[in-house]
Structure formats: C-alpha cells, structure tokens
C-alpha cells in the first residue's frame, strides 16, 4: 500500500470521529432535555405561589449549625428575585392569561439551585 493510499484510507475515519462527536452531542442534548422534562413533571407547583410545595419526606426549612433560621437569606434572595421578575415583566408586551411553561420550569429550577447553594454554604 502506498503512502497516498494510506492517507486516503485514514480520512474517512476522521469523518467518522467527527460524526460520532456530533451524534454524542445530540445524545447529550436529548438526555438533558429528557432530564429537564422529568424534573418539571415531578415537581408539583402550586399556581399563585412563588415556590414549590415540598415533596413528602423532604427536609423542612434549612437551619444553620448554630440553630438559627435561614429566613433572612431566603428573604433577601426572594426580594432580589422579585425585583428581577418585576423588571422582566415590564419588558413583556400585553398581559398573558397563563404562564409560559418554560418560565415556570425556569423558576422552579432557579429555586432548587438557590436552595442547593444555600444548603451547601451552610454545610461547608
């Protein structure tokens, strides 16, 4: 086999690697979408409230090691989040009758992330 034939023989494999990487990214994106759908379907939301209803067996309000309540931090975060929501609502055109499902999901996800960060800050 000549050098030229070897180099041509290697080129299709490079194309396969690129295709596999592209398919891998698509697979990751599909898995992420499926996970987001699973989270949104498993998180019970109560219309008209800012947060979620805790699932049965979930821990109650977070406490610091000294026993003090985490309410001041939660209030600060809630006020900050409301100010952000207020500014984004001013940008919307016209009233909407029902909340966008994506925005509901994002709000629930933001709350969970904030709770996790708060918990980790208290723990470590």
From Swiss-Prot:
InterPro entries: MAGE_N (IPR021072). This is Putative melanoma-associated antigen 5P. Residues 30-44, 82-100 have a biased composition (Polar residues). It comes from the Eukaryota. It comes from Homo sapiens (Human). Expressed in many tumors of several types, such as melanoma, head and neck squamous cell carcinoma, lung carcinoma and breast carcinoma, but not in normal tissues except for testes. May negatively regulates apoptosis. Residues 3-124 form the MAGE domain. GO terms for biological process: regulation of chromosome segregation.
């Amino acid at each position: 086999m000549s050098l030229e034939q070897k180099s041509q023989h290697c080129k299709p494999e490079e194309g396969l690697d690129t295709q596999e990487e592209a398919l891998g990214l698509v697979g990751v994106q599909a898995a992420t979408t499926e996970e987001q759908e699973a989270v949104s379907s498993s998180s019970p939301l109560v219309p008209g409230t800012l947060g979620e209803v805790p699932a049965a067996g979930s821990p109650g309000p977070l406490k610091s090691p000294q026993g003090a309540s985490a309410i001041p931090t939660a209030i600060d975060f809630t006020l900050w989040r409301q100010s952000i929501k207020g500014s984004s609502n001013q940008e919307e055109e016209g009233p909407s009758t029902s909340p966008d499902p994506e925005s509901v999901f994002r709000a629930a996800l933001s709350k969970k992330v904030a709770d996790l960060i708060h918990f980790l800050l208290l723990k470590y």
